[in-house]
A protein has these predicted regions:
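Structural motif
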Residues: 5, 32, 102-104, 123
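Histidine-centered divalent metal-coordination motifs
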Residues: 10-12, 72, 104-106, 121-123
């Protein structure tokens, strides 16, 4: 199975479209989104092509191939408009004998990791 990993779209239809094109071009089976999908956050400038109302249907059209974790700019209102789970702080993926912990990095990171065993991977 081929995975593509992306993060921090911040409502940019420009970057969401590029991500979707890369996903299709690379013939990936699944897309792992590491948060910050629709909102840019109060500390950030508007990203190029900011259009969250266009990003929503693009992502919802891929919902059967997505796994997503929450970013620091994601909120409950995002879950109301997205048709796939977006509010988990992390996801755990078994890969062979290892576990891959997928997270945005604002809760779990290299300084404050989730419970990792030797050889596990933190994204």
């Amino acid at each position: 199975m081929k995975w593509m990993i992306a993060s921090d779209l911040h409502g940019s239809y420009f970057y969401a479209s590029q991500m979707q094109q890369a996903f299709e071009r690379e013939q990936a089976d699944r897309l792992l989104l590491l948060g910050d999908l629709l909102y840019h956050g109060p500390r950030n400038d508007l990203p190029e092509g900011y259009a969250p109302k266009q990003v929503m249907p693009l992502l919802n059209g891929m919902k059967d191939r997505l796994l997503c974790v929450r970013g620091n700019c994601d909120a409950e209102v995002d879950q109301m408009v997205l048709e796939f789970p977006v509010l988990a702080d992390y996801a755990v993926l078994p890969v062979g004998r290892r576990l891959v912990y997928a997270t945005h990095g604002h809760v779990y990171n290299a300084k404050t990791p989730p419970p990792l065993a030797p050889g596990d991977i933190l994204l």
